[in-house]
């Protein structure tokens, strides 16, 4: 499934099966009407936004909106323009985005539970939580994954080669073959790009 990625980055061979399993689980989640939630800190927060961006709009494939929605839009002024330019999303929520909620909760309650609070608000049983922490020990991520377990949300972890506590909790562990944070993050980007490509290819067939 991901031979091209492994050919470019052969050090990923030991985690090939886990990457493919993550792709399969995300596809199953979307087929059942679920969504993907993503969180991380610092550079991993940027990765969270990046993943959501690739899923919510066209990446490499054309994504026409559903025909029934298009028909409804064509009944209204500017409907054709809207229908022709919107792209069908794969539902994703970056839990790093909601500054009003985040700042209010951080000010009023427990700072380390900020991602857990958002997961509680946005998540549903059967969703997937992509938890990114290069060390695998970020407290706010660990609290969120514990909540995810209780809610019936499957967890895919992105960490460095050690994995930390996060890899002990996650359902699918993606451990980048590096100890250094910046190198692990470089692997993470290549992996989640491939993940987004393969998920998109499953649902949309026509190249842009």
Task: Go through the PLM ranges and name each one.
Residues 45-49, 112, 137-144, 166:
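Short glycine/serine/threonine-rich phosphate/pyrophosphate-binding segments
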Residues 88, 168-171:
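Short, structured coil segments at secondary-structure junctions
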């Amino acid at each position: 499934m991901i031979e091209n990625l492994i050919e470019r980055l052969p050090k990923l061979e030991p985690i090939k099966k886990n990457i493919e399993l993550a792709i399969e689980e995300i596809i199953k989640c979307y087929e059942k009407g679920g969504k993907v939630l993503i969180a991380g800190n610092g550079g991993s927060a940027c990765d969270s936004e990046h993943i959501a961006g690739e899923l919510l709009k066209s990446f490499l494939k054309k994504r026409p909106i559903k025909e029934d929605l298009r028909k409804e839009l064509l009944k209204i002024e500017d409907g054709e323009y809207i229908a022709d330019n919107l792209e069908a999303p794969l539902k994703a929520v970056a839990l790093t985005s909601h500054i009003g909620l985040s700042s209010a909760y951080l000010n009023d309650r427990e700072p380390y539970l900020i991602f857990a609070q958002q997961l509680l608000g946005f998540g549903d049983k059967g969703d997937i939580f992509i938890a990114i922490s290069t060390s695998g020990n970020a407290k706010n991520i660990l609290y969120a994954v514990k909540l995810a377990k209780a809610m019936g949300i499957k967890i895919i972890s992105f960490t460095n080669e050690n994995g930390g506590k996060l890899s002990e909790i996650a359902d699918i562990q993606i451990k980048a073959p590096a100890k250094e944070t910046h190198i692990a993050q470089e692997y993470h980007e290549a992996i989640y790009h491939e993940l987004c490509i393969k998920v998109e290819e499953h649902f949309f067939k026509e190249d842009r």
